Amino acid sequence: MNYNNLLQVCSDIHLERDDISDISKIIIPNAEILVLAGDIGNPMTSIYNNFLDYYSKLFKIIFIITGNHEYYGNTIIETDKKIEEICDLYENIHFLNNKVFKYEGILFIGTTLWSLIPEDYTVYNQLSSMNDFKLIKKFTLDEYRKLFINNIKFIKDNLEVNSIIITHHAPSMICIAEEYKGDKVNCCFASELDKIFMDDNVIGWIYGHTHNNLSLITQKKFMYSNCYRTDNYNKSGTII
């Protein structure tokens, strides 16, 4: 599988932390398409806008996926609307919020995904203290689960030959770092979607969120993450 430096991935930059002095040093352009797989920053801030404006000039296409952190401080609807407004300013930036984009015979399927939280009240009690439910306005556990169900349906309904799925949350428990294996809150980071990944139509799955980078690449498929705030983040890394 080789498309000659078609895709470059970055996620979990967290521009909202205000500790990045030079946005030009975050990514070294090395591909046609930049995939921003969530938790890039707060879209209500100038640094988020400046970041997209800068890299829009360096890539042919940019795909944006929202992570959970983009929504902190606002509602889901308010945040999505703001990102749409920003992306509308650029011909080459596309917000794949339950949307698809076809390029060079590849169908890119984008969604935040969220994750499968089991109907277990013990787990519910643990999860209710997480920031997603404190900092995203009008956001509940039930809403979280509904979003996941809807996003999975969106992925399945749109699969076709040569599909690459782009999500923020991880598609498999193999994406979880070894030291966190078995933790009950892993259900907020990854879901067991290996069956979808192994579908003959799927050639790749890009994700973020776990802050644990994975590069699983075979002749027919890849599963890949490149989170910014990690020791092995690759500024110029490409997948295919």
Give the location of each predicted region.
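Binuclear metal-dependent phosphoesterase catalytic core
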Residues: 2-4, 102, 186, 191-203, ...
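Active-site neighborhood of phospho(di)ester-bond hydrolases with catalytic His/Asp-centered motifs
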Residues: 8-11, 34-39, 63-68, 94-98, ...
